Regions:
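Short, threonine-centered small-residue motifs that mark membrane-proximal processing/anchoring sites
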Residues: 1-27, 218-248
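N-terminal targeting leaders for non-cytosolic proteins
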Residues: 26-119
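Extended extracellular/luminal ectodomain segments enriched in beta-structured repeat modules
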Residues: 128-135
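Short proline/glycine-enriched turn/loop motifs at strand-loop junctions of beta-rich domains
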Residues: 131, 142-144
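Residues within well-ordered beta-strands of beta-sheet-rich folds
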Residues: 135-139, 209-211
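Short, surface-exposed beta-strand/strand-loop-strand elements in extracellular ectodomains
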Residues: 145-156
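Terminal, low-complexity interaction segments
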Residues: 159-229
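C-terminal membrane-anchoring or membrane-association module
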Residues: 247-255
């Protein structure tokens, strides 16, 4: 009976779309608008993304950043994370950024506003979003860096650590030339969901912790939240039910 119940529950959740958030990073198509597709120095606005057969345009943006650690910048190519923008784009540029600077760079839909990291720079940043979200869209200029991601949970703990390698990401369809580089570089994209981060109950999610180490080759990134599975509160209920069903299945196998 328990096995039958588990199968029925998973089938029901799949029919409602709640199980769409499987433990696997996903690809997506980026729909954007810009006036400069030659030099890629101007504003590049994110309009929507396509995941499978669905289009999403209701995003959750970063509204607060807590700097746990960020290598100090004093001159030149020292330091780690900084606020950066396209040469002709609007937005913040700050070599020695405050938490508010970083939140401003990430907290909008201008893909020309990014966090730029020096090649050997180290940082630990905690990011918080405007509204609950179950998935995250990462963009990395250059497609040659790594970034460690963890979920921050309401009880003060963290989810599992996920190391992203942008050299394996798909191309996002645009390039980016910012004030610190001479020519435009292609941008890669990848989607990550809460299951990827070891979170089975979305109600526990509080924020993201991003980490760069000295051998990660300085990720230059943007991250935007989006609800892919189903809107809240069904997402919370769905993820909780899936987690309970999986636990029940494991207990059955152990008996």
């Amino acid at each position: 009976m328990k096995t039958k119940l588990f199968t029925t529950l998973i089938s029901t959740l799949a029919l409602t779309g709640i199980c769409a958030t499987s433990a696997q990073a996903f690809t997506f198509k980026t729909n954007f608008s810009t006036t400069d597709t030659t030099n890629w120095k101007s504003d590049i606005f994110l309009n929507s993304v396509e995941i499978g057969s669905k289009t999403y345009s209701d995003f959750s943006l970063v509204n607060n950043v807590n700097i746990i650690q960020n290598d100090l910048w004093t001159k030149g190519n020292e330091g780690a994370a900084s606020s950066e923008r396209g040469d002709n784009a609007s937005g913040v540029k700050a070599e020695n950024p405050t938490a508010s600077n970083l939140a401003a760079s990430l907290g909008n839909l201008n893909l020309s506003n990014i966090v730029d990291t020096e090649d050997k720079g180290k940082f630990t940043l905690d990011l918080f979003f405007t509204k609950p979200t179950d998935s995250f869209l990462f963009f990395e200029r250059g497609r040659n860096s790594k970034l460690q991601v963890q979920a921050l949970l309401a009880d003060g703990s963290t989810g599992k650590s996920l190391l992203l390698d942008s050299s394996k990401w798909q191309q996002a369809g645009y390039s980016l030339n910012t004030t610190e580089i001479a020519t435009a570089q292609k941008v890669g994209s990848l989607g990550v969901n809460l299951f990827d981060l070891g979170v089975e109950d979305a109600s526990l999610f509080k924020g993201l912790r991003l980490v760069s180490q000295s051998n990660y080759v300085g990720p230059d990134f943007k991250v935007v939240g989006v609800n892919v599975a189903v809107p809240e509160p069904a997402t919370v209920l769905g993820l909780g039910l899936v987690g309970a069903a999986l636990a029940m299945s494991r207990r059955k196998k152990a008996q």
